[in-house]
Amino acid sequence: MNIFTVNGAHYKSNCLPGLNDLLREAERHPIAYNRLKKEMEAIIISCIRRDLRGWKPNGLCQLNIVYGEKSKGNRRDYDNVVAAARKLINDALVKSGTLKDDNPSYLLYGKNKFMYTDEVFVRVEIEVLNDADRSD
């Protein structure tokens, strides 16, 4: 299995920013948005390199993602978390050289699982499946 995990709270008390957070930064200033996006992508790329160790899928692949959000405090909308995380993860996979591109010729959306957990276990787990390994 080819799984990489982004562990810990990297944006405020969450693992990754939500869509509202990204939009707020873009409204504030384009450079602020770009800085936040680059910081998050750098964190994700380091996790890709640490866990996948140069592995690349053969052709088309599918991403199955598990989002572990903190159970206490302000719960974020599922849609906001998924939209922003997918964007950041897809761009990081391309920038790390793991994927050639993030268009539908190379990447299919798989399953999204969303769970609430302790603050200690805030994370996003990404499973990258080759075309032959994926389940529809």
Task: Walk through the language-model features, giving the residues of each.
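Catalytic phosphate/metal-binding cores of nucleic-acid and nucleotide-processing enzymes, i.e., regions
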Residues: M1-D136
